[in-house]
Amino acid sequence: MFLARLLVLFSLVCISCAHSSFEQKQLKHALDFATSNRLELEILLQHYTYDSLKLEAAKFLIRNMPHCYSYQQGGEMDSVKRVRTYYSPFGQIDQTYARRWGHYTYRNLPKIYDAHIITAEYLIDNIDRAFDNWQKRPWNRSLSFEDFCEYLLPYRIGDEPLEEWRELYEKKYGYLLDSIYKGSDVVEAANLVSR
């Protein structure tokens, strides 16, 4: 019985070490991938030296950064945006524009990788705001750290250009959540904001 418990404990320690080693390799790969922007990511890590939870959050973001990018803006992208902005509210796009841009795919544009351009300041602001929302909103408080990292911490959701969306959304919708809704149901809160 004692040997079985010891074997289980030893196995758990080995698995934990292997996972930690894998995460370290991912972090090193991401820092190397950043090339000339590596200093920004190192500044971020240095910033949270004395806050272990935020440091782990920063490492999570950096480890996942080689897969995050947006597309180069300007030129064709601006033309498509202009057409979509003007015609989308009316429900139809003029046939002239449809013929010209109907086949267009922005995925042919050059990718701009976050690791190459993102700043420590942007990430620090994002991490601090995410932690504030984790504690401030009742529906976020029950999230584990792993769920927080997966669902609340990320600074982007797709391939959109980098922007300071947390501040914008907090200014636009925060007062509704602060003054009208006091519950803990995230779906109900989202419904309130979308009205």
Regions found by a protein language model. Give the residues of each.
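Bacterial Sec-dependent N-terminal signal peptides
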Residues: 1-25
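Mixed-charge, low-complexity segments
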Residues: 17-82
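Serine/threonine-rich low-complexity intrinsically disordered regions
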Residues: 5, 19-23, 51, 94, ...
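Short, flexible coil/linker segments at or flanking structured domains
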Residues: 5, 29-32, 111
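Secondary-structure boundary elements
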Residues: 56-195
